[in-house]
């Protein structure tokens, strides 16, 4: 019998299929992953709702899909069904020997993540899901890092005790699992028979844990993530270290119990430094049963794997060629790559099926830093005459305090540095007469208040409309330059970003189709989005797709400033504080409200004459807003 397999409830948005994990003819178990999909904010694997044989695959990599879409057709495998009664009979006969296991509820708590509270940013499972040990359950984010919280044991999700946006800390209850109880009578019997043969306890040995290859520089220990007595799994993070340009977690090279900690927060370490001593189990006793002997090579192979991994990574360090295939990485790794400004297409993945791991991104960043430092000395490249950043001990001159930069400041700082260095900026300054505009705006606000429209019209919406009109007349300003500097992408839509000052730093929400919206509609949208920005609730989609940016700091003062172009855009408008000034009208000086504006643009795309024409269009439109209806 044919069974249709459809996408379960994944929300309203369409997602892209990035990987198909089965092929026609495969026998599939219930809950086995079928496809991987990725949206704007996360990627996930879609599991099979039941067992069967893949008869048809209705989708391909790159297709868009959504909740309820048909992805595959399964054959229920009648042959297997015929054999089922016989198997059932055998199971029934065997049943008295082992009573069914009783299910028990177990709490799942946040492991030791330090003393600070963190925010739940994503819940990766739902009630009813069968979860394996070490499978990721939630994603949490603090001031300095984000991480996925794994399941400490296998089970079925019975209750979820947290929501996205909740604050949690070490020990917080996040879920309740239903887990299988003790096995029946047969299991103890088997254990008792095996016990005499393997009575001698395995001998414990002591092994040193050293810092792996992190480059030649010393780094500072910023966090110790385990304590004496902790049982640690291989690859579990032990400490966090931070250098001048990056931070990383140092993983355990093997499993064991922490016997001694050799470092403290604030200590300096480097490649090869001793950080801990582990107590590890020795070889299994010689009298172990034959079954155990047959399985013994597996741990040995697993122990060898970490040793082979650095070699693979070392080979990959020089292989940063562009990867045209789809990049396989979890949302956590993608976020890490965004924070470091890493193009994942250039990173070679060493995980299963080429998946990019945290270590791959860290290796790429480390190699990129080494190349950047070596390039000026080796080739005379870099910025001519650029000196290294001065190292000054400020504490010699008086009392100091060091304050960590916010997450937004760190990200935007790197972007601004790149934009300023890579884009040849030219800035035109002008003043526009907004006397009539301001009179009209105040009149409209009074009318809106009388009619209880619950809207406040600001000068920014008129500037947005004036910019949209200029972009329609001069489409070269509504473009982006290709990475190789050889082509322009001309956009047929007009989306304008407006910089908003928030307690956490500057953010730039994007307003879509400004040329198609009226003043009232834009005013309402500006009020709503600005509030979301200040509350820190903007989504990624609300900050993407911009064509041109407006940075208005007139409310804070200043007469002129030169804004930095927001790549990959090619121009930005700065708006300063308006003031009454005497203006000559041909007969006499009259008081007029003048607004200083400044247009910065990429000189590779726009020449000075076009820059002057563009700012003049804005000037003329704001001076006589009747032009907006022409």
Curated annotation (Swiss-Prot):
Keyword tRNA processing applies: no
Organism superkingdom: Bacteria
Biological function: The pyruvate dehydrogenase complex catalyzes the overall conversion of pyruvate to acetyl-CoA and CO(2). It contains multiple copies of three enzymatic components: pyruvate dehydrogenase (E1), dihydrolipoamide acetyltransferase (E2) and lipoamide dehydrogenase (E3).
All copies of domain Lipoyl-binding, residue ranges: 2-75, 105-178, 206-279
Similarity comment text for this entry: Belongs to the 2-oxoacid dehydrogenase family.
Record-listed E.C. numbers: 2.3.1.12
Broadest EC class assigned to this enzyme: transferase
Consequence recorded when altering residue 603 to C: Abolishes catalytic activity
UniProt catalytic activity: N(6)-[(R)-dihydrolipoyl]-L-lysyl-[protein] + acetyl-CoA = N(6)-[(R)-S(8)-acetyldihydrolipoyl]-L-lysyl-[protein] + CoA
Keyword annotations: Acetylation, Acyltransferase, Lipoyl, Repeat, Transferase
Residues annotated with N6-acetyllysine modification: 396
Protein name, UniProt field: Dihydrolipoyllysine-residue acetyltransferase component of pyruvate dehydrogenase complex
Active site: 547, 603, 607
Necessary cofactors: (R)-lipoate
Domain Peripheral subunit-binding (PSBD): 328-365
Annotated region described as Hydrophobic, given as residue ranges: 373-389, 542-567
Gene Ontology CC, one term: pyruvate dehydrogenase complex
N6-lipoyllysine carried by residues: 41, 144, 245
A Pfam family annotated for this UniProt entry: E3_binding
Keyword Transferase: yes
Gene3D superfamilies for this protein: 2.40.50.100, Chloramphenicol acetyltransferase-like domain, E3-binding domain
InterPro entries to which the protein is assigned, alphabetical: 2-oxoA_DH_lipoyl-BS, 2-oxoacid_DH_actylTfrase, 2-oxoacid_DH_E2_comp, AcTrfase_Pyrv_DH_cplx, Biotin_lipoyl, CAT-like_dom_sf, E3-bd_dom_sf, PSBD
